[in-house]
């Protein structure tokens, strides 16, 4: 718990029985809010009451172990003179900001002197801006993959990487999308602890979310375009291989025909007993094969 100039910030790292009882003892929130706290994962939302608001936000978070994006769920109770932040799961996002405020008197003063609404703005703003490295990392990965593709790296591993990057972009956008409307609603709510002066701050967060939404939309289009390019290049390689195999089979047809005829166990075949004729026949077949290859080359089938 942090206190500054009539404002109390309570941060709950884990919603266990002790934390639950603390909230019920010290704050008179609606019973539906308490049910939400115990109900596991919740969708992003704002519940507006006479004396307080209850918010649930989702923040994109990078998970190194799986190289994927997950969402961290955060809850807020905000009223006149207090802010309660609740963290679900194993994320340390809120905890880091809480300790930063606790250990740095300047940050504590700047964040908490202007009331609970401004403190909530600073927390939400910091949380969303903390996702910037995720966006930059995805952009670098896509740029590097694009260069490799046009250097000739088009294989199953490339297709797999494209699928992973596309999954991460879609997950990021799926998490961010509801938050844009939620933050937009916050800028229009009028309470004693959320006055009109705070609207510009929440609009600024919304502008940032719109910016990263636009960036990820570009990334998604780039990935889709690269996927089509890789498919086309791989199909082209496959077609060239099939063409080469077809040419080989066509070129060997005369040899197959003659070997089939003279390989039969029959008598009376022309020049079957003449060794010189056999060699002449091989030379003739070789000439036919070369002629077929030249014709195919001129017609650009090779």
Give the residues covered by each predicted segment.
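Peripheral, non-transmembrane regulatory/ligand-interaction domains of membrane transport proteins
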Residues: 1-197, 201-204, 208-218, 301-302
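Hydrophobic alpha-helical transmembrane segments and their immediately adjacent juxtamembrane loops
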Residues: 207-302
């Amino acid at each position: 718990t942090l206190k500054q100039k009539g404002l109390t910030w309570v941060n709950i790292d884990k919603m266990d029985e002790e934390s639950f009882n603390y909230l019920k003892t010290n704050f008179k929130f609606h019973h539906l809010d308490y049910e939400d706290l115990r109900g596991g994962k919740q969708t992003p939302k704002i519940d507006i009451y006479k004396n307080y608001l209850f918010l649930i936000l989702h923040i994109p978070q990078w998970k190194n172990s799986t190289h994927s994006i997950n969402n961290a769920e955060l809850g807020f109770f905000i009223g006149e003179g207090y802010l309660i932040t609740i963290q679900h799961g194993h994320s340390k996002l809120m905890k880091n900001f809480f300790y930063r405020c606790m250990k740095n008197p300047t940050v504590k003063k700047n964040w908490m002197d202007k009331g609970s609404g401004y403190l909530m703005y600073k927390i939400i703003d910091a949380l969303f801006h903390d996702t910037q490295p995720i966006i930059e990392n995805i952009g670098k990965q896509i740029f590097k993959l694009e260069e490799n593709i046009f250097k000739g790296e088009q294989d199953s591993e490339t297709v797999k990487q494209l699928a992973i990057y596309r999954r991460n972009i879609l997950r990021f956008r799926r998490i961010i999308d509801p938050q844009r409307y939620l933050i937009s609603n916050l800028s229009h709510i009028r309470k004693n602890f959320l006055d009109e002066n705070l609207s510009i701050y929440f609009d600024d967060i919304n502008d940032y979310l719109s910016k990263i939404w636009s960036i990820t939309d570009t990334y998604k289009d780039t990935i889709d375009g690269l996927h089509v390019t890789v498919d086309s290049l791989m199909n082209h390689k496959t077609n060239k291989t099939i063409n080469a195999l077809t040419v080989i089979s066509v070129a060997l047809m005369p040899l197959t025909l003659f070997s089939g005829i003279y390989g039969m166990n029959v008598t009376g075949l022309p020049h079957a007993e003449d060794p010189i004729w056999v060699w002449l026949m091989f030379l003739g077949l070789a000439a036919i094969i070369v002629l077929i290859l030249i014709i195919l080359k001129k017609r650009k089938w090779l």
